Amino acid sequence: MWQKLRPPKPEPESVFKAEDDLQALSEAMLDQIVSAPDWHVATIALNGALEAWLNSNQADRQPVVIVGAPHTNNAEILKLWAEEQKWRVIEPPISDDILAQNENWLDQLTDDNTPWVLPSLEWCYLRHTQGLALIRRLFDQLWSDRVSLGVIGCDSWAWAYLRHIWSGRMPLVFMAQAFTHQSLEAWFKTLAAGSDLAPFLFRQQDNGKYVLEPPPELAEEIDPPVEISSFLERLASHSRGIPGVAWALWRQSLLGEFNEALSEEERQQVHQFRATTVWVRSWDQLKQPAFPADFSQTQAFILHTLLLHNGLPVKLLAQLLSLPATEVFQHLCSLQAAGLVENGAELWRVSPLGYPVVRQFLQGEGYLTD
């Protein structure tokens, strides 16, 4: 009797899929399976990390810096946190004021004696002979009784550089914890569970092993016992546990057999009886950016400068490197074609997919890294 009432057990799938039988998922499908992260969740963790500091005696509070690696969305999280706490946000000075050493911007630290958040310290200096005076003055003022309570956010590369050039007293530092393969799995499951097409089974394309453990309601129907792939362990290691890097690589790894022409009613009928299998490229088959054949020392300087400032517009980058803007733009286009940098809102940055290989190269060449 119960067998008649229960949905039929899904037919076993082949333990692997030839890549020719699969296709990369469309952006619309990827947005269903790996949606954009909700950084409001991160503000809860940040609040927990700062709880003791917030509750301490005001006279004993040291200035605080929250350091995050590239693509951790550190500044965005701090802006959300400031909004929740009703603290005012201090935007970075414009580059002309930094180079002119205009200290009027520092007055915001003492305005109204109200608490503040400075989300992007990396945009408050420039690696230039005239570009460090303002941030040195900022560090001096942090310990003044006139400065109201504040939290500073800083990219990890900029923080490494500032520690290198500043020998004075340093603030209290908190660093975002890197994601492990377990936390990546929990995160990816949460993102997928929010889809209208859930539940999903994530299996490695070349051997059929499960990349994410199946949902409990489906695990009991799987025969033979579930074997787990090592994909997430390699992803966590390669991405250095940086959520934005891991998220981009995860999206790139997914393949499917979806018929996106199905109507919503037909999709609901399909998912009434079985989960959708999303196939994951094996780690060795995952295509990652590589340096162009004509990669030059100038391009290495460009990448390093972009990382030290968490992104720059072309003209300012050219000014810092003492190169013609047209030449810098040509180099950026070459690096963009290789997948190493990206451009958005007139700002060039090292891309999430390119970051691991760029960091490894710069570290190997003896550049200052985070």
Segments (PLM) and residue ranges:
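The conserved phosphate-sensing helix
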Residues: 224-251
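Winged-helix-like regulatory helical subdomains adjacent to P-loop NTPase cores
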Residues: 243, 248-327
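Terminal-proximal interaction/regulatory segments of ATP-powered molecular machines
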Residues: 339-370
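Sensor-1/coupling segment of RecA-like P-loop NTPase cores
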Residues: 122-166, 173-184
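Conserved small helical "lid"/interfacial subdomain of P-loop NTPases
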Residues: 174-228, 237-238
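Conserved P-loop NTPase "ATPase switch" module shared by AAA+ and STAND
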Residues: 90-135, 152-154
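A short, basic N-terminal segment
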Residues: 1-60, 363, 368-369
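Short amphipathic alpha-helical interaction segments
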Residues: 322-338, 343, 353
